[in-house]
C-alpha cells in the first residue's frame, strides 16, 4: 500500500512542479517565447496569448497536483478521491490542448499517460481504503 501512495505522490509532484514552472513562465511572458511557443498556435482558439492558459496551468494543474502530492504523502483519507480528480483533470487538459493547438509534442502524450496512471493509482488506493473500512464495519457489527 505504501508503494501506491509513494508512486502517486511522485507522479503528482513531478506533474505539479512542471506545471507550476511552465505556468509561471507563460504568466511572466504571455507571448510564450520563454517556452519557444508561438502565439500563432492560438489562432483558432479563444486566446490571443498564453496568459489565461498559463494561469490555469499554474493554479489548477500545478498547485492542484502539488496539493495532491502532499495529501498522498500524508496518506490522507481523501488522497484517492483528490488524485483521481486531478488525474482526470490532467487528461481533460491535455485532450483540450491537443484539440485546440494540435498534438505536436511527445510530452503531451506523456502527460496524458501520467494522468491515466494517476487516476488508476488513485482508484486502487480508494478501493483499498473502502475495502478496509468495510472489513472494520463488519468486525464491529455496524
Regions found by a protein language model. Give the residues of each.
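Topology signature of small-to-medium multi-pass alpha-helical membrane proteins
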Residues: 1-142
